[in-house]
Amino acid sequence: MRCSVLVICSAALFAAPVHAQDSAEALRQDIRAVRQTLQAMEQRLDALERAEGRSPASPPEVVSVAPTAIAPAATLRQAASASVPGTGQAILPPRDSVADPSSAASRPDSAAGPTDPELKGFFAIPGTETVIRIGGYAKLDAIADARAAGDEDQFITSSIPVGSAHRDTSNFNLHAKQTRFSFEARRPTSRGNLRFYLENDFFGSSDGYQFRLRHAYGQLGNTYAGYGYSSFMDADSLPDTLDFAGPGGAGYLLVAGIHHSFNWGKGNTLTVAAEDPDSQLAGTTDDTIAVNRLPDVTLTARMERDWGHLQLGAVARSLGYDGDQRDDRRFGGGAQLSGSASVGERDLLLFGVLGGKGLSRYTADLTGSGLDAVIGADGRLHALSLQGGFVGYTHYWTPMWRSNLIYGQLTMARNAALAADAFRQSRYGVFNLIWSPAPSWTMGMELLYGQLEQQDGQRGDTMRLQGSLQYNFIK
């Protein structure tokens, strides 16, 4: 403030018309008068600053800028909460991910996620406390299948053909459907941090590039409402693959719901959620319909530390159908334990195991397959049992090169009411090599193997080679 006043006063004095001086002595008198005026103003400013409780002689703060380097995890986590309003303190160690499911996940107090600890790319709306970001990435996938894989765009093991006449047909595919756009807004409020998140990709149809909604939600404090990840799933445990589908034994579901998290402190939270129900049944006929009379209810306990995290989730469901001759109801539900753990300097171990009855909707391989329960010949509804899981390991060869080794499996119990060609078991294996020469640029190669077994014991398998190029808009 003082420097500004002095500059203005000096400019005004020297800009005034200069009158002719009779002698050098008169000029010196004018200079002394200017000095006295400036000293008087400086004393007055000192008095005003003392009255405001500031030190009159304190110099402006100098912010030093260090050379570009890989910042420690703690520094990155602190930077996000300090620079972006409406953000809680992140805890998990930073990690890389091509699909980056963590960035869209809802978190207590809208904390930064492990794939974006600095929350880069936000800019302020003038005159408000709101900051916004437009993000996403463009991704091109080149895919070569040794045999028919069923789904040409994603490696979904439950869709592998078994006993098909065209089973041995190889295929090449090139697509950019994983390309996505996101919009995010954050701001602090008197009731907690406010976050709005919107995300789309182009997996809306199998034969084109139809826009698909992935996330659309708002979160105030620890209360979430909208459409996005189920509270039951754990986005931070999903492994780093070029393939978009990931292991079939992982918990995965996009659904509308309301969540509320209770923060116990020290990285411990408990989340309760009510989510849109959908009884996905096998054995239905023209005169039977699935009914949903209660929301799916989930309860999730989570522990986060600087070495990783553990999450235990449970879901309870009401499954049912109505028919012309009979109706029936069954309880469904299950649990999942998942987590991550740092190994060495940058390596990471990821895992998840789940099991239950009527849980197919909540798995990556079987969501939408109609295998939560089956209607028997006697009209009774039978909730189908399943177990599954995955494990993944990320190894950094150098700061720019990394590899992932992943295995997943999902198994459903045999049931006489199911069709002979219904799902029995799937296996998923991946090895990849990923190069990220710059934060916004990633490319890699991935080898995938998948196997599907039907209820009658018949099997089919295939191998896929996938290459990907990805450009992140902000990273």
PLM regions and their residue ranges:
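Sec/Tat signal peptide C-region and signal peptidase I cleavage site
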Residues: 16-20
